[in-house]
Amino acid sequence: MHSQPYLLSPTPNTPFPPAEHALHEPNGLLAIGGDLTPQRLLAAYRSGIFPWFTEGQPPLWWSPDPRTVFHSDNIHLSRRFRRSLRTSTWTVRADTMFAAVIDACASTPRRGQDGTWITANMREAYLTLHQHGYAHSVEVFDGTMLVGGIYGVAIGRMFFGESMFSTHNGASKIALASLAYFLHTHSVPLIDAQVENQHLLNLGAERWPRRDFLTSVRRLITQTELPACWSVLFGEKLSRDLV
C-alpha cells in the first residue's frame, strides 16, 4: 500500500504508475503533476485513470475503488419520466456543439459543489481531444436552444464519461440515455461514470471492483474505434423515441 501519490514528470511520455497503486484515502488518488496533452490524457484513460482537480491545483490523477460504471443497455428511466417524453419535442444530436456542452458543464450550478473542476486548461485539453476525434458530446435541444448534454472520451469500444448538465428538468437524463442507446447499438458496452453519487446509482450505475473495471478497459480499448465524428452516424433523434 502506498501512503503518498506519485509525482509525475512534465515529460508527456512519462508512464503512469499502475492504477492499483492508488491511495485508499483519498480514495483513488494515484498521481500528481504531469500535463494535459492528448498523449497524457489518452494514456490515462487507457490505464483506467482520469484527471480531476480545481483551479490552482496541479493535475491530480485518480482511479477509485470501487469504480462507477453503466452498462450501455441498462439506463434506468422512471415510468413517470418516460410518460413525460411521449409529448416531448426535444431533439438530440451528437458532436455538433462540443464546446458549448463543455462550457455549460463548467458553468451550470450543482448542488453541493462550489465552483468547477473544468478549468480553462482542462477545457482546452478536451477541445483538442475532440479535434483529434476522441472526445465527443451528445446534445439535447429545445428548438434551437441547448438545454442538456454530456461529453466524454471514446477509445476503442469503451466510453469514459466526464460530465453532463441540464438547464431544463430531465435534459441530462435524455442526453445520457441517448448516448447509451447509441453506444449499445454500436457495440460499446460500458460507460465509465468515475465516482458514484446517488443520482448516477438511481439511473442504473453499478459499483465495480477496480480490478474488474481495469480488466474490461484493457479488453475494450483494443477494439475497433468508432468514427472520429459522430454527427452523421448519430443523426438527429426525437427525445420521445426513448420511450
Swiss-Prot record:
Keywords: Acyltransferase, Cytoplasm, Transferase. GO terms for cellular component: cytoplasm. It catalyses: N-terminal L-lysyl-[protein] + L-leucyl-tRNA(Leu) = N-terminal L-leucyl-L-lysyl-[protein] + tRNA(Leu) + H(+); N-terminal L-arginyl-[protein] + L-leucyl-tRNA(Leu) = N-terminal L-leucyl-L-arginyl-[protein] + tRNA(Leu) + H(+); L-phenylalanyl-tRNA(Phe) + an N-terminal L-alpha-aminoacyl-[protein] = an N-terminal L-phenylalanyl-L-alpha-aminoacyl-[protein] + tRNA(Phe). The gene is aat. This is Leucyl/phenylalanyl-tRNA--protein transferase. It is found in: Cytoplasm. It is an enzyme of class 2 (transferase). It holds the Pfam family Leu_Phe_trans. GO terms for molecular function: leucyl-tRNA--protein transferase activity. GO terms for biological process: protein catabolic process. InterPro entries: Acyl_CoA_acyltransferase, Leu/Phe-tRNA_Trfase, Leu/Phe-tRNA_Trfase_C, Leu/Phe-tRNA_Trfase_N.
